[in-house]
Amino acid sequence: MGAGGRMTVPNKWEGEGDEKSQKPVQRVPSAKPPFTLSEIKKAIPPHCFKRSLLKSFSYVLYDLTLVAIFYYVATTYIDALPGPLRYAAWPVYWALQGCVLTGVWVIAHECGHHAFSDYQWVDDCVGLVLHSALLVPYFSWKYSHRRHHSNTGSLERDEVFVPKPKSKMPWFSKYLNNPPGRVMTLIVTLTLGWPLYLALNVSGWPYDRFACHFDPYGPIYTDRERLQIYISDVGIMAATYTLYKIAAARGLAWLVCVYGVPLLIVNAFLVTITYLQHTHPALPHYDSSEWDWLRGALATADRDYGILNKVFHNITDTHVAHHLFSTMPHYHAMEATKAIKPILGDYYQFDGTPVYKAMWREARECLYVEPDDGANSKGVFWYKKNL
């Protein structure tokens, strides 16, 4: 059938060259949906849109308490362990602390959406402190991320993870389109992807001049936003200076073990979560002839991270609802998701594939986008893999 309907196309989901592993991809419909945003909103209980300052702070307190407990246990007991146990204990600490700090990151992200409380100044103060502590320029990313939400799924205006057409793929892509190349690409993306995006706009929208999240006069920002970009930079400088003083007092190796490696895990999770939310063989992208806000917002996928769904405050498995109503607090998002599923029908995309398998599959299957053949397919682009 045409690109407007829910379409089944052949795709290898597991393994390469294994015919038994072939399963069909059920594409999300790309035609204009038979429902409106207001109809979706009416299906959600009204209390889901209410923000509680006390409840939001309770999540901050809970996460920071866990951070403090893990820090205390690590710095008090790990070095006292025998050698082999010590080397085994540090990775456990890194994993636990990295996961909890990712939850802290998500709360700061929620502040940027004004989903933390009814008071914008409270949201901005909390978000600035939490994100700065994780070396994220709060206001800078808040504004670029807002543009992503305003233009999701648009090949011409989306802010990040914008897929390229085949004609614009770099020359070296074909040399990386193999298992060793994918492993190398994933390692670089997970370790360096987030800081490179902030500093050099890597994987971001290609502006006509150099773009950087730390530059108040860069093309990402308007004149009205520049003062707050300075504030973000001050927050980063304050956090960096604090880390410098800690390293001077305790040693760089101590700082890397206690803070640096968990932060690396936070950054890796951030890239993984964002990539898998917007990259899937079933999801369409649109050019200006077809794009509209609702279809773009629906071109996202919910994923299953197991117990980490709760640790990450359900940003992983309620992302569709988040894109539709970004000021909704996370503690109501599960209820809202259940309420909107019957309305969305085939327009709702959930994939329960284990995360490590999904990352590998998407790295293999989702290399570039092109429209399908046929007049009815113009303006709607789908992921392809044959370079």
Swiss-Prot record:
GO biological process: unsaturated fatty acid biosynthetic process
Presence of keyword Protease: no
Enzyme Commission number: 1.14.19.-
Coiled coil: none
Alphabetical UniProt keywords: Fatty acid biosynthesis, Fatty acid metabolism, Lipid biosynthesis, Lipid metabolism, Membrane, Oxidoreductase, Transmembrane, Transmembrane helix
One annotated GO molecular function: oxidoreductase activity, acting on paired donors, with oxidation of a pair of donors resulting in the reduction of molecular oxygen to two molecules of water
Stretches that traverse the bilayer: 58-78, 88-108, 121-141, 183-203, 229-249, 251-271
Motif mapping: Histidine box-2: 145-149
Membrane topology: Multi-pass membrane protein
Compartmental location: Membrane
Source species, domain of life: Eukaryota
Short sequence motif named Histidine box-3, residue ranges: 319-323
Example of a GO cellular component annotation carried by this entry: membrane
Principal subcellular localisation of the protein: membrane
Residue window of motif Histidine box-1: 109-113
Region (Disordered): 1-31
UniProt pathway annotation: Lipid metabolism; polyunsaturated fatty acid biosynthesis
Enzyme class: oxidoreductase
Summary of the function given for this chain in its UniProt record: Delta(12)-fatty acid desaturase producing in a heterologous system linoleic acid (18:2(9Z,12Z)) and to a lower extent hexadecadienoic acid (16:2(9Z,12Z)).
Domain-level remarks: The histidine box domains may contain the active site and/or be involved in metal ion binding.
PANTHER family according to UniProt: OMEGA-6 FATTY ACID DESATURASE, CHLOROPLASTIC
Family label: Belongs to the fatty acid desaturase type 1 family.
Name of the protein described by the UniProt record: Delta(12)-acyl-lipid-desaturase
Lineage per the UniProt record: Eukaryota, Viridiplantae, Streptophyta, Embryophyta, Tracheophyta
Gene encoding the protein: FAD12
